[in-house]
Amino acid sequence: MALFGALFLALLAGAHAEFPGCKIRVTSKALELVKQEGLRFLEQELETITIPDLRGKEGHFYYNISEVKVTELQLTSSELDFQPQQELMLQITNASLGLRFRRQLLYWFFYDGGYINASAEGVSIRTGLELSRDPAGRMKVSNVSCQASVSRMHAAFGGTFKKVYDFLSTFITSGMRFLLNQQICPVLYHAGTVLLNSLLDTVPVRSSVDELVGIDYSLMKDPVASTSNLDMDFRGAFFPLTERNWSLPNRAVEPQLQEEERMVYVAFSEFFFDSAMESYFRAGALQLLLVGDKVPHDLDMLLRATYFGSIVLLSPAVIDSPLKLELRVLAPPRCTIKPSGTTISVTASVTIALVPPDQPEVQLSSMTMDARLSAKMALRGKALRTQLDLRRFRIYSNHSALESLALIPLQAPLKTMLQIGVMPMLNERTWRGVQIPLPEGINFVHEVVTNHAGFLTIGADLHFAKGLREVIEKNRPADVRASTAPTPSTAAV
């Protein structure tokens, strides 16, 4: 009985679980590109290492090592991998760091000073980034693990006191190696929890698309990593800006991502597009009013000829009044995605009337229009764009079958009017697109769209339009390195 109850609760929870409207998969194919950009960023961060001055005394010799700066990172071997539980793991082995520092030596009344180059060799770094969902639904670096070690140090001392420095070099280089070991992991911890999070802050969560609607890209759960990819589930739901708490129930199928051949895949379900169209419908945007000169001249003449019998019965003051054509969508359009293509079904009312000045309008006809549009999706940069095309069009009377027959001559000119006057306006808006949840400075290239039953996927490669350093510097928060919590680092001496 207890087992039955547990099963029932599990099924009940599953029945109420909301599917994501948008999914993104980053595959291992992207890791080489990400690693190249990440290592450039890492080298720049390691150059910010601040090593305390090293002072000491050996016999009558007093030495001071100061102004230690990391000048370069030379890599022999590095790997970036997905790891379950850890998300991203970077391993650097047998690398070397170039350093430059100021030396000062005092022996009785003799003083020597200057700058010298050194190198830290056999540098190994193993650092992992743990990704999670924060309370606002944003992806964050929630933890950074780190192990770092420097095997040996070498400093090319020279000059009059070369033999003295050679005598002291063991003390100096051992001390520098110890201090350097202690500084690598704190720098990486700050880079992950502060700087990389400032990059992730550029990913839209709840943002405006235009003056009418917004979109919710909040993560529904923590990112899930396997050995070959990283999967993220986003709500992917539009909403009217005047009803920010409104939500369309998601009854669409869950999009599936199986491919791993491209760097990244994005999947959108029918719910993603349905919520967009319903949001615009609720915002009152799906209507069109043409009056007087706004009605195409040929269509004006055809409409007057079609309703000539009704017009001649009106008073002379009304007969030559401006014509009004009003299209109003009656219900939220719906999207259907099949392997053969994507279609959008629309039902609207069409009202034709005369609008004499300073008098009530005179309605000539009211009809219903059924239209089916084909939709082609494309991903450009980081914007999902849509191109619409009118495929099927039918009008019929709300009153009688006889009047529906009389409307047949209007079918072609009304369709032409929609294709020439309405579709360009729609496409101007839909081709502007909506941004997908991607950090600033990263774009998609070489996109391929594939339709499935109930959802579509877009495979693409990644392109860094801006470097990580450029984006992070633009969005860098106030430096909180001093207040950062103690790093979970392990530095091997």
Curated annotation (Swiss-Prot):
Changing residue 94 to A: Increased nuclear localization. Residues 1-17 form the signal peptide. CDD domains: BPI1, BPI2. InterPro entries: Bactericidal_perm-incr_a/b_dom, BPI/LBP, BPI/LBP/Plunc, Lipid-bd_serum_glycop_C, Lipid-bd_serum_glycop_CS, Lipid-bd_serum_glycop_N. Widely expressed. Highest level of expression in the ovary, thymus and placenta, with moderate levels found in the pancreas, small intestine, testis, lung and prostrate. Low level expression in the kidney, liver and spleen, with very low levels found in the heart, colon, skeletal muscle, leukocytes and brain. Expressed in the cortical neurons. Changing residue 117 to A: Increased nuclear localization. It catalyses: a 1,2-diacyl-sn-glycero-3-phosphocholine(in) = a 1,2-diacyl-sn-glycero-3-phosphocholine(out); a 1,2-diacyl-sn-glycero-3-phosphoethanolamine(in) = a 1,2-diacyl-sn-glycero-3-phosphoethanolamine(out); a 1,2-diacyl-sn-glycerol(in) = a 1,2-diacyl-sn-glycerol(out); a 1,2-diacyl-sn-glycero-3-phosphate(in) = a 1,2-diacyl-sn-glycero-3-phosphate(out). Glycans are attached at residues 64, 94, 117, 143, 245, 398. Changing residue 64 to A: Increased nuclear localization. Its main location: secreted. Disulfide bonds join 146-185. It is found in: Secreted; Nucleus. One of its GO terms (molecular function) is cholesterol transfer activity. Changing residue 96 to A: Significant reduction in phospholipid transfer activity. Increased secretion. Pfam families: LBP_BPI_CETP, LBP_BPI_CETP_C. Keywords: Disulfide bond, Glycoprotein, Lipid transport, Nucleus, Secreted, Signal, Transport. The keyword Transferase does not apply. Coiled coil: none annotated. Glycosylation is necessary for secretion and its phospholipid transfer activity. GO terms for cellular component: extracellular region; extracellular space; high-density lipoprotein particle; nucleus. Mediates the transfer of phospholipids and free cholesterol from triglyceride-rich lipoproteins (low density lipoproteins or LDL and very low density lipoproteins or VLDL) into high-density lipoproteins (HDL) as well as the exchange of phospholipids between triglyceride-rich lipoproteins themselves. Facilitates the transfer of a spectrum of different lipid molecules, including diacylglycerol, phosphatidic acid, sphingomyelin, phosphatidylcholine, phosphatidylinositol, phosphatidylglycerol, cerebroside and phosphatidyl ethanolamine. Belongs to the BPI/LBP/Plunc superfamily. BPI/LBP family. This is Phospholipid transfer protein. It comes from Homo sapiens (Human).
